[in-house]
């Protein structure tokens, strides 16, 4: 990235950090059980609600206790369960039509990050009927109150019940629209470990590492605060302790509750401190190939942290010490290496691969442009990279073939697109792009 653009990105991030205490962040009020949801809607005089979920969740009967509680309270439920793994513009528009046709007055997001994002975007389109989702991409392009929104997460990963973000995919172009607005933060949430008990081990693993990514990227970024650091540290501790248990023993209610708490805390951390290039790259992969977001984050996280090099060592090393992965006697570089090794071991123990299948070399320029557009200047990453440099991050998680091995060799002999960029930037990061704590 050229010097002028670097200066612009850092100036943008500095202004945002200064403004942070004055921005209208809020944390959702936590409800007690499905009866608490019904009581809240009754107090708000809501007699018809839109329930946004997916067919898998409904087929397992997870929504039934909530549906029964609402019916007992005399509240009608219109169910939209066509949400797909990477929710599309078409999903959002179909949910919006159902909301309007049924005369709904509130929305319940019941599911993982996909259902949450679909519900948030549906609310945004109801609040902004004349503004398409493409025009809401970026920061603060909704700016209108949404209908009453209640979030019920069934995975412990996205933390969407606490965040101002939603990501929607254009089904035709595969472009992902990250929408960030304070209006998208749900005012109420229900954290119920019972609805996560049946989560399959592999989904438990990848969604848990999604929460880990939120916490780590929030902690090492340039917009971190004391409060977000505390939330991130507690989230990482809980994940290190409870994710292996939840993966191995899905019925362990304590581990499930701790993971919901971790995802919630990580969500509060990155809502204020933002994420980094792990997310920017993962979003582009999800949009282009349908790669699950949690899986992409899990595979990318240790590779990107290592690629940041010395620029991330101070903060990442401090995090490693605070969560007990490293010793106070370790240097920042040693502590960082131990933390990255811990992530790789967790992934391996839970069957998460080191690479992602299906990424095509010819797609890298377009993928990297999407990541560049999403990440810069918004994400306060330790090392700034432009689209050309970001291509290296994709190659780190591509299965090794003769073709991309030759590409990497060419880069090492003078090219400017892959691993040598990372090595060069690691050598210069401390003097050029290091983010002081």
Question: Which residues are covered by each model-predicted region?
Answer:
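N-terminal small/polar loop signature for handling phosphorylated ligands or for N-terminal nucleophile
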Residues: 58-130, 245-256
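C-terminal catalytic subdomain
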Residues: 273-338, 344
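Short glycine-rich or small-residue beta-strand-to-loop segments that form or flank ligand, phosphate
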Residues: 48-54, 78-81, 107-110, 150, ...
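An N-terminal, well-structured beta->alpha segment
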Residues: 1-79, 437
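Carboxylate- and glycine-rich phosphate/diphosphate-binding segment that chelates Mg2+/Mn2+
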Residues: 165-273
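Glycine/threonine-rich beta-strand-loop-alpha-helix active-site module
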Residues: 90-194
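C-terminal charged capping/lid subdomain of soluble metabolic enzymes
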Residues: 2-7, 316, 326-437
């Amino acid at each position: 990235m050229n010097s002028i653009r670097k200066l612009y990105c850092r100036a943008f991030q500095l202004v945002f950090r200064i403004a942070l205490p004055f921005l209208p962040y809020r944390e959702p009020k936590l409800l007690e059980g499905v009866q608490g949801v019904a009581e809240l809607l009754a107090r708000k005089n809501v007699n018809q609600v839109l329930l946004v979920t997916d067919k898998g969740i409904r087929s397992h009967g997870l929504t039934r206790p909530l549906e029964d509680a609402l019916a007992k309270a005399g509240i009608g439920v219109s169910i939209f369960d066509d949400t797909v793994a990477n929710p599309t513009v078409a999903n959002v528009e179909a949910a919006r039509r159902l909301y309007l046709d049924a005369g709904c007055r509130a929305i319940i997001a019941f599911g993982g990050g996909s259902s949450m994002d679909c519900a948030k975007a549906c609310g945004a389109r109801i609040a902004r009927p004349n503004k398409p989702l493409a025009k809401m991409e970026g920061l603060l392009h909704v700016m209108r109150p949404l209908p009453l929104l209640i979030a019920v997460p069934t995975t412990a990963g996205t933390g969407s019940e606490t965040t101002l973000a939603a990501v929607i995919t254009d089904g035709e172009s595969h472009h992902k629209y990250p929408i960030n607005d304070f209006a998208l933060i749900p005012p109420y949430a229900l954290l119920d470990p019972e609805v996560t008990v049946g989560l399959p081990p592999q989904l438990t693993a990848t969604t848990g590492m999604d929460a880990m990514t939120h916490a780590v990227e929030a902690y090492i970024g340039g917009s971190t605060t004391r409060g977000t650091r505390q939330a991130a540290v507690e989230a990482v501790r809980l994940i290190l302790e409870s994710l292996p248990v939840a993966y191995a023993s899905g019925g362990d209610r304590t581990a499930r509750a701790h993971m919901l708490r971790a995802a919630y805390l990580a969500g509060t951390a990155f809502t204020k401190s933002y994420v980094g290039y792990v997310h920017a790259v993962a979003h582009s992969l999800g949009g282009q190939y349908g790669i699950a977001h949690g899986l992409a984050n899990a595979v990318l996280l240790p590779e990107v942290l290592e690629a940041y090099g010395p620029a991330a060592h101070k903060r990442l090393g401090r995090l490693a010490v605070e969560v007990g992965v490293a010793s106070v006697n370790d240097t920042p570089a040693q502590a960082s290496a131990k933390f990255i090794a811990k992530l790789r071991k967790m992934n391996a123990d839970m069957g998460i691969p080191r690479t992602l299948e299906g990424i095509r070399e010819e797609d890298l320029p377009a993928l990297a442009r999407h990541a560049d557009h999403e990440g810069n200047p918004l994400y306060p990453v330790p090392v700034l990279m432009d689209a050309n440099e970001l291509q290296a991050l994709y190659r780190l998680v591509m299965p090794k073939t003769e073709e991309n091995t030759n590409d990497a060799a060419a880069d090492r002999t003078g090219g400017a697109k892959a691993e040598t960029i990372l090595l060069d930037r690691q050598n210069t990061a401390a003097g050029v792009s290091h983010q002081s704590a």
